């Protein structure tokens, strides 16, 4: 009887292990909803972010254009701007910051663009992707991802995405860790027709500047 019970327990444990493994694999392979995504491949792991390209088109055009090298910058035409840069600033229980080619918080792409604040996008949960700046209208290439909700940043920094996978990686990032590569994923007709080149950036820049006047 004892052998039968032990065998039954082993079967149950094996079944649960296989089931849980299957659930984990299924969740990892779940298809993404239509949208525009950025996959940050870092030295600590991958971070998948959904970009708010409809609510903050200029900011997302800038980010995607720099990531893919389809937009002009001071790193050279056609260069994937973010690849190989570091997270130069990390404040525990606050945020991680990257996107500076100088590596010390003073650099950028060679230009600035206006804030693009959408009141429906807030720093209200962990994993918010937002633009770093040195005051109004000083956005460039630097961005940060939050560890926790940071409501005092609302209205001061442009929120343009949020983490949907890899918040544990965000929390594990330390100063000096590397952004190996940023891949942009387009799913659905709207995302596939979204352009992130210099002409698109210039047109959106002009529209936003006129709107603010």
Q: Where do the language-model regions lie?
A:
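Cyclophilin-like peptidyl-prolyl cis-trans isomerases
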Residues: 2-9, 15-213
């Amino acid at each position: 009887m004892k052998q039968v019970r032990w065998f039954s327990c082993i079967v149950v444990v094996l079944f649960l292990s296989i089931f849980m493994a299957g659930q984990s694999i299924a969740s990892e392979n779940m298809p993404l909803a239509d949208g525009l995504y950025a996959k940050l491949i870092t030295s600590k792991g991958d971070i998948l972010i959904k970009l708010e390209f409809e609510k903050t088109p200029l900011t997302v055009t800038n980010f995607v254009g720099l990531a893919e090298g389809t937009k002009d910058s001071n790193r050279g035409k056609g260069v994937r701007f973010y690849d190989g840069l570091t997270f130069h600033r990390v404040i525990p229980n606050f945020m991680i910051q990257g996107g500076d080619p100088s590596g010390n918080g003073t650099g950028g792409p060679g230009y600035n663009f206006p804030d693009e604040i959408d009141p429906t996008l807030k720093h209200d949960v962990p994993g918010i992707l937002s633009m770093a700046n040195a005051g109004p209208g000083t956005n460039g290439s630097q961005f940060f991802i939050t560890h926790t909700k940071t409501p005092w940043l609302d209205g001061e920094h442009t929120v343009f995405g949020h983490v949907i996978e890899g918040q544990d990686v965000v929390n594990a990032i330390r100063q000096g860790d590397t952004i190996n590569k940023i891949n942009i994923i387009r799913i659905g007709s709207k995302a596939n027709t979204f352009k992130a080149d210099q002409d698109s950036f210039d047109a959106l820049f002009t529209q936003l500047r006129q709107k603010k006047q």
